[in-house]
A protein has these predicted regions:
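Acidic, low-complexity intrinsically disordered regions
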Residues: 1-118
Length: 118
């Protein structure tokens, strides 16, 4: 049985400038599967929820840095998110992955270096 669920987002300069990211299908499915009662289906238009997560800063369980993933819905219903500290860690072209580790019940945020986007 799979021990993890994942979501992936390719970071753009606009995401970094605005600190707001449109939730793609993988993010919506990730939240729905990992946190069924906290997902976008349970956020009213104009509301938000906060999930505790951890940046993977190395290969050791003890090298994770706490962060927050904020899930939002605009008044018209658009699904958005922001990740605390992302602008200090990522650049346009990087790929951000959310991974749910069922064993520890943690969301791990990983950044993969990508090509620069202009």
């Amino acid at each position: 049985m799979n021990q993890t669920s994942k979501a992936r987002i390719k970071i753009t300069q606009r995401m970094l400038n605005k600190s707001i990211i449109d939730a793609n299908k993988s993010v919506v499915a990730f939240v729905r599967n990992c946190y069924p009662t906290l997902g976008y289906d349970f956020i009213e238009n104009g509301g938000k929820k906060v999930l505790l997560a951890y940046y993977d800063d190395g290969h050791s369980f003890y090298r994770y840095t706490p962060t927050q993933i904020r899930l939002y819905r605009r008044p018209r219903g658009d699904k958005l998110l922001s990740v605390e500290g992302l602008t200090r860690r990522a650049k346009a072209g990087d790929v951000m992955t959310f991974e749910h580790d069922k064993e520890s019940n943690r969301i791990i945020v990983r950044l993969e270096l990508g090509e620069d986007i202009e």
